[in-house]
Curated annotation (Swiss-Prot):
Entry's transmembrane regions: 1-21, 33-53, 65-84, 97-117
Reaction(s) catalysed by this chain's protein: fluoride(in) = fluoride(out)
Alphabetic keyword roster: Cell membrane, Ion channel, Ion transport, Membrane, Metal-binding, Sodium, Transmembrane, Transmembrane helix, Transport
One cellular-component annotation, GO: plasma membrane
InterPro entries per UniProt: FluC
Gene this protein is translated from: fluC1
Protein family per UniProt: Belongs to the fluoride channel Fluc/FEX (TC 1.A.43) family.
Protein name (database record): Fluoride-specific ion channel FluC 1
Keyword Translocase: no
Amino acid sequence: MKKYILIGLGGAIGAILRCFIRNTKIPVYKGEFPISTLMINLSGAFILAVILITANEIWSFNEEIRLGIATGFVGAYTTFSTMCKETIILMNKNLYFLAFCYVTVSVVFGLLFAYFGALSARKILSRLLKVRKEDEKAS
């Protein structure tokens, strides 16, 4: 039961944050490209990789907490269905090349952001563990 509560809480926070970012206007951008959804999904790929690397390889997160963050927060924060809807909207406006670019950039850069999220987590956390070991030796 606890894991469902944590997933729900994480989901509520992720959905609220996504809505906030989605409704934030980027003053220098006025085009058709759905930049806010792209930013949300790319940052979500990065965040999910960091969380999973941290939970699985560095610290042993409680499974319920990991699910609350990964499934709840990141699952509600990112939005594949909105990306699909926005792609269809671009296609309905005969903006086929822009739709193609949107899907391509979303997938390719999503994978890159996930890769760099995993890389960043490993690098930062290995440094933290090294500092912790040095502190323990010094004491």
